[in-house]
Structures are given as C-alpha cells and as structure tokens.
Amino acid sequence: MKFAFRSFTGLALGFASISAADEVVFKDDFAGKLGEGWTWVREEKSAWRVAGGGLEVRVAPGNLWGHANDARNLLVRPAPDAANGAVEVSVAVTNRPTHQYEQANLAWYYDDSHMVKLGLELVNGEMCIVMGREEADKTRTLAKIPIPATSVGLRLRVAGGRIRGDYLPAGAEKWIEAGAGELPAPPNGRAKISLHCYQGPPDAEHWARFAGFRILRIKQ
C-alpha cells in the first residue's frame, strides 16, 4: 500500500525542534529499521513495516479498551522516570479510518489494563482526538475533540503522578491541550511508552503510520 505523506512529513519535522535546555533521551526517525530498545506485544510480523521514514502498522481487529485486551502489534519501550522531572513524548500520526472506533495511539502504558492513551480515532463517523485513561480495565474518556484531519502530532507530558495530552494539527504553530489527569497506579507497575492501533475492519487492509518519535527530559 502506498502513502502520500507530504503533509505528514512536514508535520513530523515541524515539531522536532526542541529547546536547547531540554535533553533528548531517545529519538527514532524510523530510518530503514526500528531504533534500539523497542519490543512488541503480541507481534504479528506481517502486519508492520518500516518504510519511507515512518513505521506503518496494520490497523487490525482487536481491542485494548476495557477487558478484551487482544489488540496485536503494540510497540513498547521503557519510559524514563518522571518522578523527579517532566518527561515529554511526541510522535506524528496518520490514520485514515472507516470503522467505528478505529484508532492509532500514543500511550503511557503499564500493561493492557493500565494506561493513558492519546490518539486519532473515528467516533460515530467523525474524526476525533481521543484521550482516555484505563486502570484495572476500568475506562474513562478524558477528551473527545472533533478534528478534520487524518495527520496530527501527538504529545504526552508526564510529571510526578500527572499526565497531559496535547495535539498539533498540520500547519499549526502551537500545541493544543486535549486533556489531563492522574496516572493509573498498577501494583509494581513499570511505565512504558507505546505506539499502537486497533479496532480495524476485518474485511479491509488499513495501515496507520507513525514518524518523528521523540522522548525528552524537560528542564524546568
């Protein structure tokens, strides 16, 4: 499947600039392969690829919201400790869904039952930025914001026990806050960062795309 991602590439480059005071902990431009340190949860090798400076993942049937926890191809890596300083994670996402709740997300992820996700999702026929919190499989929507776009920047900022989600529409200069809340607190939970997508149609092949992934330590 071919993608025409000129605006997407510009979006990824547009929010890659950072303050000189901030520390780049990790970045991945998906230049021909995945960067070091990523692992897959329920990997299906035929349903992901790295191409053209981006990670493309098939949006397959399955779910991660609530009790089902059968979504495939969750890409995860350890998150920096945010107890003593803010951590910021960002990525550019393109998603062209046709199926109810079909979505592509950036998440602060502990396990399948504990996370905060921020993504581009189709809800009742409308493209939306959706932010949601899940703890012990109990879910709560923190934001659902209609947006007429299939490509967007997503950003999570975590400090202490709080998390905030922002989004950056293509062509915009300033991030827009989507929502905020408390992090879930799983017993002995170790925070990870995840890129994932799910709730795709069973009878069509849809692919979401991620680019320009960054983890920063924010200097206050």
Residue ranges and their predicted role:
Residues L11-A20:
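Hydrophobic h-region of N-terminal signal peptides that target proteins for export
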Residues A180-H206:
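Flexible glycan-contacting loops in extracellular carbohydrate-active proteins
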Residues N63-M127:
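Secretory/extracellular carbohydrate-interaction modules
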Residues F30, V89-V91, V152-A180:
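Carbohydrate-binding surfaces in secreted/extracellular proteins
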Residues F30, F210-I215:
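Extracellular beta-strand elements of beta-rich domains used
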Residues A21-W40:
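Extracellular carbohydrate-recognition regions
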Residues R49-N69:
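Short carbohydrate-recognition loop motifs
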Residues G132-G153:
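Short, aromatic/His-centered strand-loop micro-motif at the edge of beta-sheets
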